Amino acid sequence: YKTFMLLLVATVLLFFDHSVINNFFIQVVNHIGGNSADMGNAIFLAAVLELPTMALFTKFQKKLGCRQMMLISAIFFSVKHIVTYFAMNMFMIYVAQVMQMLAYAVFIPASVYYVSQLVEKHDMNKGQALVTGAMTLAGVFASLAGGVLLDALGVSKVLMIGAIISVLGTICMFVSVEDVDKHERES
């Protein structure tokens, strides 16, 4: 499971900026002149757009394959984080939030399917727990480091650091994700 370990690293890297943005979203929105109502609208937009993607995941996965879905998710996490970094107004934040439908909403079902196809049946629960643990580790690290970095560096620099970390996560994802659909076809 060597590539699976790198997938966990990719997950931590991708979810670090995701968690920083979510945990400190009001600071991000205020930084570009928005307010709590704008933040609520942005969160609502992302949440509403996640639902159809998750509901249609199986259809997309059968057409594109799980590897492609994992890579699409990683790319859109990074695109979302980069757009958030460059956002100058709420419109750009809303554009970034739209990316959620191909980032988080794809990653959650894709990672479950991926683990179920990659690891042996007796390791499946451990595999799922490790992915969830990687997301949780990113959230804890983002909460601790994000607050300190925001105080020390400000919103813009923290978003830049997060976007760079996210791109590194996407690169790790490209290196680590195997074609598990091939495993399914061979069995």
Predicted regions and their residues:
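Loop-to-transmembrane helix entry/capping segments in MFS-fold secondary transporters
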Residues: 36-37, 119-131
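Structural signature of the two symmetry-related core transmembrane helices
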Residues: 68-83
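A late C-terminal transmembrane helix in Major Facilitator Superfamily
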Residues: 125-152
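Helix-to-loop junctions at the C-terminal end of transmembrane segments
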Residues: 53-65, 150-151
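Intracellular juxtamembrane helix-capping segments at the cytosolic ends
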Residues: 106-119
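Helix-loop boundary and gating motifs at the non-cytosolic
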Residues: 3-10, 14-42
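Multi-pass alpha-helical transporter architecture, strongest
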Residues: 163-187
